[in-house]
């Protein structure tokens, strides 16, 4: 049995400032055709300005932890951390365009500030019951939240319900339209609702029967980008967790591993999410799209009215910004080791026969099975289920 307390504080630098290199050098570009007054040369345009004063991002890190081991069987580890990142490399957002340089050509600067905090917990229990039986179980849980304190972001006008898109929010926070479920299902079901939408929607496209109803958050009688609000979370999971275990009985062994995430969201707008992406991709929940007949019959509706092109329903909203929380059985394996007495006669030291599976079960919050919550893009190769049979022989 032992107990260990840990604490640390440090100031560190981060030189991983993105893929763009040589930000301290100004660029110029040529083009635009031949100009006679320049001796038939080409025009020279100012490109991105360099910043010779760039430096590393600085992070102030704190960590406090405790390690406990009891009776050589149970071990616990708990950590709490805080991090303040300063001089984060960002693009200026509050410089007026009338200064003469296109905003996209302004140099990057060390001005951003981001805070992180969270905790991690891990527990392991090992037990040998007798000479034949033993088992191990292990679990972990982590919570992490980041907040962008300063990103030199220009404040939007006062008639925007939410005047910032970065400042005060987590990195990658999703914004979109909130669906109005006050009529029971959140769709335009009646001619009266359609007439109102036609008079108020300025989101791009023309609303139709079966499209989403949006909430006029600033109550100005118009549905437009001023009504966009933070939706769910960012793509970075706030919670990650997992648990695993193994059991041994005589010559048999069994193991499993589960992992999952929670409080993570992503905007899906490509293959599998919409019915018209990449010349058409009909998915499972499109079978339960809104139609007048389905609505009149009181059937379950899981998707807005189908179309051949993006409309008002395909804007960022709390339908297409999906909760990608999931719990997945990453691996499970059963094995048997043949008795050594049978093998020595043929010169074999050990033989183990096994069967295992990967990604066999997934529990997720999404309403469609076509999109996998672990994929970074709709075009990535999908996560596959696999079952393997094998034999390990040692001579």
Sequence positions of predicted segments:
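Active-site-adjacent bridging/hinge elements
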Residues: 36-43, 90-93, 118, 215-223, ...
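Conserved small-residue
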Residues: 109, 126-235
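C-terminal extracellular loops and terminal segments
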Residues: 106-115, 157-174, 230-242, 246, ...
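Surface-exposed, low-complexity loop segments enriched in small/polar and acidic residues
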Residues: 95-109, 158-165, 173-178, 229, ...
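Extracellular/periplasmic, surface-exposed regions of secreted and cell-surface proteins
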Residues: 1-171, 316, 321-395
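Glycine-rich, aromatic-lined ligand/substrate-binding cores of catalytic
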Residues: 234-268
């Amino acid at each position: 049995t032992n107990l260990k307390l840990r604490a640390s504080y440090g100031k560190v630098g981060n030189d991983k400032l993105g893929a763009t290199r040589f930000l301290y050098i100004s660029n110029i570009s040529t083009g635009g055709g031949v100009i006679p007054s320049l001796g038939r040369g080409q025009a020279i345009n100012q490109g991105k300005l360099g910043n010779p004063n760039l430096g590393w991002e600085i992070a102030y890190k704190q960590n406090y932890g405790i390690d406990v081991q009891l009776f050589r069987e149970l071990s616990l580890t708990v950590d709490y951390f805080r991090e303040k990142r300063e001089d984060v490399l960002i693009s200026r957002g509050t410089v007026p365009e009338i200064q003469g340089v296109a905003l996209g050509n302004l140099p990057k600067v060390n001005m951003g500030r981001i805070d992180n905090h969270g905790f991690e917990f891990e527990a392991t229990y090992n037990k040998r019951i007798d000479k034949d039986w033993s088992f191990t179980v292990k679990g972990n849980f982590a919570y992490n939240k980041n907040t962008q304190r300063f990103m030199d972001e220009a404040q939007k006008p006062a008639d925007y319900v939410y005047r910032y898109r970065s400042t005060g929010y987590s990195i990658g926070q999703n914004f979109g339209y909130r669906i109005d479920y006050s009529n029971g299902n959140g769709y335009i079901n009646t001619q009266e609702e359609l007439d109102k939408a036609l008079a108020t929607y300025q989101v791009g496209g023309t609303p139709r029967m079966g499209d989403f109803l949006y909430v006029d958050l600033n109550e100005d009688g118009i549905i437009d980008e001023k009504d966009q609000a933070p939706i769910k979370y960012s793509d970075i999971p706030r919670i990650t967790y997992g648990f695993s275990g193994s059991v041994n009985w005589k010559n048999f062994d069994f193991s499993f591993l589960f992992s999952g995430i929670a409080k993570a969201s992503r905007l899906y707008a490509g293959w599998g999410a919409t019915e018209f992406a990449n010349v058409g991709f009909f998915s499972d929940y499109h079978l339960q799209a809104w139609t007048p007949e389905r609505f009149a019959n009181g059937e379950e509706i899981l998707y807005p009215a189908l179309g051949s092109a993006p409309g008002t329903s395909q804007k960022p909203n709390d339908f297409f910004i999906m909760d990608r929380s999931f719990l997945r059985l990453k691996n499970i394996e059963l094995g048997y080791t043949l008795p050594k007495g049978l093998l020595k006669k043929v010169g074999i030291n050990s033989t183990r026969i096994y069967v295992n599976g990967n990604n066999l079960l997934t529990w997720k919050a999404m309403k469609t099975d076509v999109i996998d919550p672990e994929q970074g893009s709709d075009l990535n190769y999908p996560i596959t289920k696999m079952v393997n049979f094998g034999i390990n022989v040692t001579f």
